[in-house]
A protein has these predicted regions:
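Structural and coupling elements of P-loop NTPases
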Residues: 1-213
Length: 213
């Protein structure tokens, strides 16, 4: 009943997200606009409409349930729209959740480019993707953030992180990773805008939601 974005009575009654909602926050001096979308298959159309306006997506996967059929559907939609994607394995605090097995499942069912960003081992593998990344890794033991952002933007890496959202476990790590590595679409030379949602306020006035491009 205290959900910040699930404000519609139907959402509160059913305990799920039905309508996409927007929130704004600042993290590590970076302004972030969050679009929360439904994860339920019955409302996938609402989710699909937001994809073209995203710089990047966070795909939440249950650590207990793993990759489901709708997870794969959402993954295909994200790839079709070429949305750079971060994955958050949720509920990993519960008994029986095997992180290594879940990572193998993600690589097998979604993409072999899913990379565990909870440590630093992923850098060694990512370094092989380009001469610039390899040179930096060999000389400094790290890869510049802009090079990592390029790999993510080109869908050559899909960062995976673990946590338990209800307990805020892993959320700070996720936000830090987004602030450092999430790519941003370049602005167009001419003014433009893309509408992704039509809604109405409490007085019935029509609201048009858009992203300026």
């Amino acid at each position: 009943a205290d959900a910040f974005l699930d404000t519609d009575p139907q959402e509160r009654e059913r305990g799920i997200t039905i309508f996409s909602k927007q929130a704004r926050l600042t993290w590590k001096n970076r302004a972030v606009t969050l679009l929360d979308t439904p994860g339920h298959v019955d409302f996938s159309g609402e989710t699909e409409r937001t994809l073209p306006v995203l710089d990047a997506a966070i795909l939440v996967v249950s650590g207990t349930d793993g990759v489901q059929s709708h997870t794969r559907t959402l993954w295909r939609l994200l790839r079709r729209n070429h949305v750079p994607t971060f994955l958050f394995l949720n509920k990993t605090d519960l008994p029986g959740v095997n992180r290594a097995a879940r990572m193998q499942e993600l690589r097998s069912l979604l993409s072999p480019e899913c990379a565990d960003f909870s440590g630093m081992d992923w850098m060694e593998q990512a370094a092989a993707e380009s001469e610039a990344a390899l040179e930096s890794f060999l000389s400094a033991g790290t890869i510049p953030p802009e090079e990592v952002r390029r790999l993510i933007a080109e869908e050559k890496r899909f960062p995976c992180l673990f946590g338990a959202a209800l307990r805020l476990d892993g959320v700070e790590k996720l936000l830090n990773t987004l602030a450092l590595y999430a790519p941003v679409k370049p602005a167009g030379d001419a003014f433009g805008a893309r509408v992704y949602k039509i809604s109405r306020d409490a007085q019935g006035a029509r609201l048009t939601w858009l992203r300026v491009t």
